[in-house]
Amino acid sequence: MATPQLSPGVLVREVDLTVGRADNVLDNIGAIAGPFEIGPVEEVTNITNEQDLISVFGEPKNNDAQYEYWMSASSYLSYGGVLKVVRADDDDLKSANAGVGIASTTTLKIKNYDDYVNNASDTSVNFLYAAKNPGSWANNLKVCYIDDFADQTLGVSTANLSNAGATVGAGVTAAISGVLPGSGSTSVFTGYVKGIITGVNQDADGASTIDVKIVSRVSSAGAETRIDYAEGDSFSSFGTSNPLFFVNSVGVNTGALGSQATGTTAASAVDWYDQQTLGLSNSTIFWSTLAPKPGTSVYVSDRQGHNDQLHIAVVDDNGDVTGIRGNILEKHIDLSKASDAVSNVNAPQRTYYKDYLRDLSANIYAGADPLAAADAFHGTTPAATGFTAYTGVKAASFAPETASTNQSGTVAQDKQFLAIGAKTYTIMGGNDYQTSGGDGYKADLGKLITAYGLFSNKDEVEADFIIMGPGCTTEAESQAKANFIISISESRKDCMSCIGAHRENLVAAAGTPGGSLLTTEQQTTNLLRYFGPLTSSSYATFDSGYKYTFDRFNNRFVYIPTNADVGGMMARTALLAFPWFSPAGQQRGVLNNAVKLAYNPSKAQRDRLYPKRINSFITSPGAGTFLFGDKTALGFASAFDRINVRRLFLTVEQALERAAQAQLFELNDDLTRANFRNIVDPYLRDVQAKRGLIDYLVICDETNNTPDVIDNNEFRADIFLKPAKSINFITLTFVATRTGVSFSEVAGRV
């Protein structure tokens, strides 16, 4: 090849002939969908252990045998696998919420994070706060809110505050004079402290109060300086020694700027924040014990904004969720009303309260802005916390900020955000599945199929075992569910479906924790009738089991299906041995957490079941309960009618498919083909050494990569495998011979 250099020099080139390799395949990922108590709806969630299952999807419930779904998931996890779980939807499923102007809206359903972002995160929604996911679990949770509404509560001895000029939005001033400490110096100051009234509480007996937000300090020469409230500091707060003067933009009780004809001495002056509680029914918790007073964040202050901070706490007031009254589930401090706010400590963490709760709260989403309008039902009225200007005439310096431009969700620049003070919202109206007659957990077949459909795309969701769990109400629905799950595996061709029996075919009374009321002959006939019409597939397994196990959450024994255990056994076999070993038998097929079986078939009954693709679970004295069959659901004789062969091919195919992807867009020549053979051959030799193959052959040369194949931009490799077979049938022949007979005369003849 001619050098690309045009003048003397050294060109360094690299050629990589190591592209691609056959990586190990860890196939221990199960998948199940069902009507769980809590958790995101129609969203695939990774679960690694039972504690994760409890945290994300709640505990098992007695209603509608929902525990069968939950305990099937738990059973699979007990074998060492990981699980992908989808919570199925339902038309009756609704999210608990605090409505806008009402207790709650009855139509709200926020399925998951994406559903909130796409459909429920703008300000036009009809809820203020909503549970993170649907269901009754969040009913009566309290969302406690507080912002920088006021600095002080001042007592005013009058029965008519408006006549005195003390109305929301009006200014309040008090004359001050004295030595003002500065930075390394002092100065004599004469002027007044200026604030804005944010709340009034009129008392008929004259013990009225006003809530005041400190705004600025104004000198006698008219120079105005923004200040922050400092309790007990006469230059930064109001006291009981100097008269209060109420002033609005047109001059209440007209007089010089910042004064009026007659002053009113405050009867009392207390810190507003110190008086605020979370507003709970069963306990009294002061906000000051949880966090410092909200004020202005560094981000907003740097942009000449004010009063953006707020705190939010989520409290289990009645103990319905945690069993502890007044239990604080979450506490979110120093959130912001500014839509562009960023944490000064954990940048670039966004602190806008809706974004923050969306990403970091475990229990709630935020909806409509409570600062957008007054809410008579919840008793909130947004109040201005400052004036439009801080110099000049009353018309500007005592005109409250415009409400529409200072709501939550606006950018920080030059904003003086409105406030509503301390408010507690009760979220309610959450409903469970098919709630007629009480909280239910009956999953609709159509919704279950939609949920399982989320596992269909193998490029998006990794799955090795799709677990059916329990069947549906009728046998026909159970068969429809089973066939759909099998179709997923047939379409993906990289996983297996674990199909179980219809409950009423084995246990006569659904939901009854007692023993089976059916004879074994009836159970056998029922199983043959149920499994007979199901789709023939080597990507599925059928089993006969329902096991009797203890439900520690409801303190009782229950029957649950064993198809999740079959998936778990295959995962355990891959972890402890290799995927191409059979998961059945006393070594690898032992059933976890089983007291007894609903159906323990005899040899004669197994002889009827096994030819019909049904693997039995049996209990054997001295050996325990284990899987006694390793057939796939294939309806005809083939090497793929055994689980270990199908699992061998799944493992090899996945490993070599990844290796083949590295050959895409390479040149189809001897070098590429040799490189691919050098990847495949050592891998298959290793599988053979580990007892997965009897023999193999790899053809990837000019015999199958003909000129026509090459011209069609194709690459072909033919891989022939002789899979190892599991032992299903054992014959022991004992022959008695006469003393004088030589064994060579009779060996092989009987």
What are these regions (language model features)?
Residues 150-155, 175, 335-345, 738-750:
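Short, cationic low-complexity segments
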